[in-house]
Amino acid sequence: MKTGSVEAGEQASEDATPRRGKKLNRGILILDLVLRVFGAICTLGSAVAMGTTSQTLPSSSQFFRFRAKYNDLPMFMFFAIANSIVCAYLVLSLRLSIFHIIRSAGIITRIILVTFDMVMLVLLTCGASAATSIVYLAHKGNASANWLPFCVRFSHFCNRISGSLIGSFFSIIIFMLLVILSAVSQFSICN
């Protein structure tokens, strides 16, 4: 039976819960900062790899030159621009992420940040999916449309654009983790 006073064990567990929640929230915010840095590196690498991709085939004739550049296809240009925009956003959002670590009370700015995270996730996914369809056609071709695969001849070009896609898909996974971390962080603040 309980008496009027609170037992020592119950009081200690009640005091430990807010501290544990603050430490968990601070850990989530630090992980958010680290993921933003890695996401910026991945998107910057993808944009640079795509933007500097070109290959010219050697030819025996002076009149014919076969060249493949990323800006020959609008999907690759959209991919490079989308990755550049997302990289700029991630660099700019680092300031807010550091602010949240220092002052964890900024709920409105967290909601704004997760909203922009979702918008950037959609933009990055659109760019990566558009470029993926063209990379698939470059590697496999399409027999019914009589499109031959050109990665047999432009292997360096195709390797660079494929590597660029890998970096972009890593960034998509990072953005998914950022949105999940934001939801967990909001839940821990509310409770």
From Swiss-Prot:
Annotated disulfide bonds: none
Its annotated compartments are:
Cell membrane
Segments spanning the bilayer are 28-48, 73-93, 111-131, 161-181
Q: Where is carbohydrate linked to this protein?
A: 142
Annotated InterPro entries: CASP/CASPL (IPR006459), CASP_dom (IPR006702), CASPL (IPR044173)
Q: Give the family, as the similarity comment puts it.
A: Belongs to the Casparian strip membrane proteins (CASP) family.
Q: What is this protein called?
A: Casparian strip membrane protein 4
Organism of origin is Ricinus communis
